[in-house]
């Protein structure tokens, strides 16, 4: 397959692209910084500096859209919220326009989203049919998905990746949590009762490959079948590192530090991968402690 990818130097892209190359696919990465992308991804990947030079995507078999400003790196000022939205919406709209301008469009657009689509639903078991709670993360993801779905046609199916917390050794949530936990300074956040829907990076990559190869469309919760509470996650991470994890971080401190974006760690979703499992996808990593032991070793 000839596959175009945005966000290729991000956490998921860095793990996905080597697998796609192993499988014999031809990969083109859309990037703002070709020099950086080349150093990260190597010489086997073709690079496009943006999409301005493209008038259509004829000859492209699939598009995987992973681009977007990291959501938890900065406080959510008005300006930062705008960056979070536009970094996702604009590139997605450009891809949709190119797909719709193609005589032979890609057969699939796999486009990013997040379990934040649902907002903070507390104890509710969240499948893809669950009505969302209307807050910023929902508004961001709902518009992102709505734009992507404009590419849907008889020739092009659209799959939406409602991604949970990705566990990987080289970034994501563990990139922030590992330093204090390695020092024995980790612990639950707030009450610790909030749910965390996690997925091992291997299952994330394999899930995308599954959607690439199977005639599926619509939203998919990209999460393990077994979400855990924050306090369970903290205990499991401490256990994987052979360190205590008992220093609870008060919710008040998190709110002072993060502002509105504190909802990302003080709230959560008890999300389940209902549609992936119904379609026959087999997860490799069910047990959180085993998954964490694998990524921190």
Swiss-Prot record:
Superkingdom in the source lineage: Bacteria
InterPro entries xrefs: DUF1731 (IPR013549), Epimerase_deHydtase (IPR001509), NAD(P)-bd_dom_sf (IPR036291), SDR39U1 (IPR010099)
Pfam family, one: Epimerase
Similarity annotation: Belongs to the NAD(P)-dependent epimerase/dehydratase family. SDR39U1 subfamily.
UniProt protein name: Epimerase family protein YfcH
Organism: Escherichia coli (strain K12)
């Amino acid at each position: 397959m000839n596959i175009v990818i945005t966000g290729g130097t991000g956490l998921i892209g860095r793990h996905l692209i080597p697998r796609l190359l192993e499988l014999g696919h031809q990969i083109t990465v859309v990037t703002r910084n070709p020099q950086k992308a080349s150093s990260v991804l190597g010489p086997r990947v073709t690079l496009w500096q943006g999409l301005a030079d493209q008038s259509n995507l004829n000859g492209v078999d699939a598009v995987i859209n992973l681009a977007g400003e990291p959501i938890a790196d900065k406080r959510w000022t008005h300006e930062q919220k705008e960056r979070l939205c536009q970094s996702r919406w604009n590139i997605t709209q450009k891809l949709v326009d190119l797909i719709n301008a193609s005589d032979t469009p890609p057969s699939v657009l796999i486009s990013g989203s997040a379990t934040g689509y649902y907002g903070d639903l507390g104890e509710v078991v969240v499948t893809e049919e669950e009505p969302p709670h209307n807050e910023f993360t929902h508004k961001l993801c709902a518009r992102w998905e709505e734009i992507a779905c404009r590419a849907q046609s008889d020739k092009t199916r659209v799959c939406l990746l409602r991604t949970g917390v990705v566990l990987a050794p080289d970034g994501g949530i563990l990139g922030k949590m590992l330093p204090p936990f390695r020092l024995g300074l980790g612990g639950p956040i707030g009450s610790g009762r909030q749910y965390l829907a996690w997925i091992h990076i291997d299952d994330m990559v394999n899930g995308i490959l599954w959607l690439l190869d199977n005639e599926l469309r619509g939203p998919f919760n990209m999460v393990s079948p077994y979400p855990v509470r924050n306090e369970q996650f903290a205990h499991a991470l401490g256990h994987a590192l052979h360190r205590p994890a008992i220093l609870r971080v008060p919710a008040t401190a998190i709110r002072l530090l993060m502002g509105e974006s504190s909802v990302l760690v003080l709230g959560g979703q008890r999300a389940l991968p209902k549609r992936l499992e119904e379609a026959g996808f087999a997860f490799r990593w069910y047990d959180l402690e085993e998954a964490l032991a694998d990524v921190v070793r």
